[in-house]
Swiss-Prot record:
Cytochrome P450 monooxygenase; part of the gene cluster that mediates the biosynthesis of 15-deoxyoxalicine B. The first step of the pathway is the synthesis of nicotinyl-CoA from nicotinic acid by the nicotinic acid-CoA ligase olcI. Nicotinyl-CoA is then a substrate of polyketide synthase olcA to produce 4-hydroxy-6-(3-pyridinyl)-2H-pyran-2-one (HPPO) which is further prenylated by the polyprenyl transferase olcH to yield geranylgeranyl-HPPO. Geranylgeranyl pyrophosphate is provided by the cluster-specific geranylgeranyl pyrophosphate synthase olcC. The chain crosses the membrane at residues 15-35. It is an enzyme of class 1 (oxidoreductase). This is Cytochrome P450 monooxygenase olcG.
């Protein structure tokens, strides 16, 4: 009898486990289906016998450009596509002005849906209202002294430069000289985006679980713990110091760095100082290092343009003392930067939003509540807008600046429907002014202090991962020290 009870119990347990597994499977299966009738075509959907969107996402990773071109050939206004983030709506560039300042289209909720902040270790991408407020409020390791030609991995070298340069501005001399902090910054910049990329192929329900075992997430959590040991003692020491000054009725020293600005903005509200500092560093470093890498590759192919830029720096430096105002006179450099970004933006699409309500746009196009949407960057390569759009013309925006009605559109930091490298409208990149200044300062040092050229005859191939484009992280350049014609008047950090 006892054996019978045991057998019955085991059978029941197996039944419960089987039922639970079936429920989970069905939930995952149904989560990938779309029951709504779409007003625009869907491309790259599931193929026959595919039960999830995983293969669709992998196909998009491999050939996003082809799918986007195919989509617009079917529907000029836009289309739905299974992207790395699931189903998203890709709209024609003409709709950029319609959504740019419309509060019903929200960048922050889009980010929360796509950057996976619910995965342990990826809370760098999770900003509550206070975090958004702080980030909005707040917003090298030298290449070489070798006189002989030698090869360096450009992307990693520039990432180190940007890490030190940003740390000097944000946190002061102590942080920009701390090799542990600089390594944490560069490692997190690489690991965070790698982790998101790897997790996106998994169904939403599985991502938090997979994140505990994914190597990139595990290392990322370890790096955050290391960062806490650096940031938290400094924050606590300052809080104790201010409390002592308050008791003694003396004026505390004024700290001009992002730690202090975050503290001021947060006030008495609780927040995570370490994650805040890492998020600021991540925001400053990732896109800037990628952009500067591609910019140097572009210049390597155009030695005459390198010389023109050097002459501009020398001319401006002789007329103006080195400082913030000086870089605004580097108009050719500004044009070259904008042209590089035009040809290789950070992605094939931009202006990513989530529709908070159903909205009717021009042409009667209906955007449904909850839709994830983005604008195609296709106007940046449109021959009707930019003559010879496939050709790199460093003087393109310099010449445009001479035309009164186009002058304001020619600046590197300006945004419009024909150039959305920084987005457009109320959610345009708030850090673009700092990024522009940081890039110009770095480029002045590189151009005056180094000769550089490509390794091999072919230019490094731009990498495409889904809708994201990336300067080749594996390519090297040959570089050697040169004697600069003028001093930039900057002491070592």
């Amino acid at each position: 009898m006892l054996q019978g009870v045991i057998d019955t119990h085991q059978a029941s347990l197996r039944g419960i486990l089987a039922t639970g597994a079936l429920v989970i499977f069905v939930a995952l299966f149904l989560a990938t289906f779309q029951f709504q009738v779409l007003c625009l075509p869907l491309i790259n959907g599931r193929k026959r016998f595919e039960l999830s969107l995983t293969n669709s996402k992998k196909r998009y990773y491999a050939d996003a450009k082809g799918f986007i071109q195919s989509g617009f050939s079917q529907s000029k206004n836009g289309f739905y596509a299974i992207t790395e983030n699931g189903r998203e709506l890709i709209l024609a560039p003409k709709f950029a002005d319609d959504i740019r300042n419309d509060k019903r289209f929200n960048f922050h909720t889009y980010r929360e849906h796509t950057m996976l902040p619910n995965v342990a270790g990826l809370d760098l991408f999770q900003l509550n209202d206070l975090g958004k407020k702080i980030l909005s409020h707040v917003i090298g390791y030298r290449l070489t002294h070798n006189l002989e030609w030698h090869e360096v991995p450009l992307r990693n070298s520039l990432l180190a430069v940007i890490s030190q340069q940003s740390s000097r501005v944000f946190l002061g001399k102590k942080f920009c000289r701390d090799p542990t902090w600089l390594k944490i910054n560069t490692d997190i910049t690489v690991l965070a985006f790698r982790a998101v990329q790897e997790l996106r192929v998994y169904p939403n329900l599985l991502r938090p679980v997979v994140g505990w075992f994914l190597p990139a997430c595990r290392v990322l959590r370890s790096e955050v713990r290391k960062a806490r040991k650096i940031v938290e003692p400094i924050v606590q020491k300052r809080r104790d110091y201010k409390a002592a000054c308050l008791r003694e009725q003396t004026n505390p020293e004024q700290f001009l760095d992002t730690i202090e600005w975050a503290e001021e903005c947060a006030g008495s509200q609780a927040y995570d100082p370490t994650v805040t500092q890492l998020t600021i560093a991540l925001s400053a470093m990732h896109n800037t290092s990628d952009f500067l890498t591609q910019l140097v590759f572009d210049l390597c192919e155009r030695p005459n343009l390198i010389e023109d830029l050097r002459q501009e720096i020398i001319s401006v430096r002789k007329k103006h003392p080195w400082g913030k105002a000086t870089i605004h006179h580097l108009k050719l450099m500004d044009s070259v930067m904008k042209e590089s970004q035009r040809l290789k933006p950070i992605g094939l699409v931009n202006m990513r939003r989530r529709a908070e309500n159903s909205v009717e746009l021009a042409d009667g196009l209906i955007i449904r509540k909850g839709d994830l949407l983005m604008i195609s960057s296709a106007n940046q390569w449109n021959p009707a807008i930019y003559p010879d759009p496939d050709q790199f013309d460093g003087y393109r925006f310099y010449n445009m600046r001479q035309t009164p009605d186009k002058k304001n559109l020619s600046h590197f930091v300006s945004t419009n429907v024909n150039h959305i490298g920084f987005g457009h409208g109320r959610h345009a990149c708030p850090g673009r002014f700092f990024a522009a200044a940081e890039t110009k300062v770095a480029l002045c040092h590189i151009l005056l202090k180094y000769d550089f050229k490509l390794v091999g005859e072919a230019p490094p191939k731009i990498l495409a991962i889904g809708s994201i484009t990336s300067a080749n992280p594996f390519a090297k350049i040959a570089i050697r020290r040169r004697e600069e014609e003028v001093s930039l008047g900057v002491s070592e950090p």
